[in-house]
A protein has these predicted regions:
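Ubiquitous "structural anchor" signal
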Residues: 18-20, 28-30, 172, 176, ...
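Phosphate-binding/catalytic loops
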Residues: 101-166, 171, 176, 183-186
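Conserved active-site and cofactor/substrate-binding residues in soluble primary-metabolism enzymes
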Residues: 20, 24, 45, 96-99, ...
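A short glycine/serine-rich beta->alpha loop
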Residues: 11-15, 90-91, 130-131
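Nucleotide and nucleotide-moiety/phosphate-recognizing core
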Residues: 3-8, 14-18, 23-85
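Glycine-rich loops and low-complexity Gly/Arg-rich segments
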Residues: 32-35, 64-68, 89-93, 106-108, ...
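Helix-loop-strand module that forms the ligand-binding subsite of alpha/beta enzymes
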Residues: 70-114
Length: 186
């Protein structure tokens, strides 16, 4: 059951190489001190069920959903883009079981503000287990964390916990570029 207005869901399976990107970003986000109205979830492979039941089970209405996943948008491995449900052609966004996630997102978009943050994968294993992200996708995690924080209106510096477990607070790194064109690489 959900108790927050903003939900950040990392989708994917860490057993299949770069498909573990969403859960890896969620792991880093959980190290941060986020506002009480934000819920960070490792949705793993349960994304279809999660999306269908999101509204029905929420005690507090969910107003914003940020989905973090791999997305093959023709970029270079490790490139990151922001998409809206209307940017997805029907059938373009499928989970590991080939379930179409575009349709439930289309249904939810009029009730919830939905953003998909996708990282171009380099390698996704399909028949054998392959633990770990490729170097290019691993390097996209800090930028993605900053993009997520920007998307939910949280300043990065205010989120670092007192133990300093968040490893990449480099002052020279951009906080996530903004864009004017949907689906444009950021």
């Amino acid at each position: 059951m959900l108790f927050r207005e903003i939900v950040i869901a990392g989708c994917g399976n860490p057993l299949f190489g770069d498909d573990g990107f969403g859960p890896a970003v969620v792991e880093e986000l959980k190290k941060l001190q986020l506002p009480d109205n934000v819920k960070v979830i490792d949705a793993g492979l349960g994304a279809p069920h999660f999306l269908f039941t999101l509204i029905e089970d929420a005690e507090v209405p969910v107003k914003k959903l940020v989905i973090i996943d791999i997305a093959d948008f023709g970029g270079n491995p490790g490139d990151v883009t922001k998409l809206r449900p209307e940017d997805l052609p029907p059938g373009a966004y499928r989970d590991a079981h080939s379930w179409d996630l575009s349709e439930p997102l289309q249904r939810l978009k009029d009730v919830i503000d939905i953003t998909i943050i996708g990282c171009q994968p380099k390698r996704v294993a399909s028949h054998e287990f392959e633990l770990g992200l490729t170097e290019e996708v691993e390097r996209a995690i800090p930028k993605t964390v900053r993009i997520v924080l920007e998307e939910i209106g949280v300043e990065y510096g205010a989120t670092i916990n007192h133990q300093g477990t968040h490893l990449w607070a480099s002052p020279g790194e951009a906080a996530g570029d903004t864009r004017d064109n949907p689906g444009e690489k950021i």
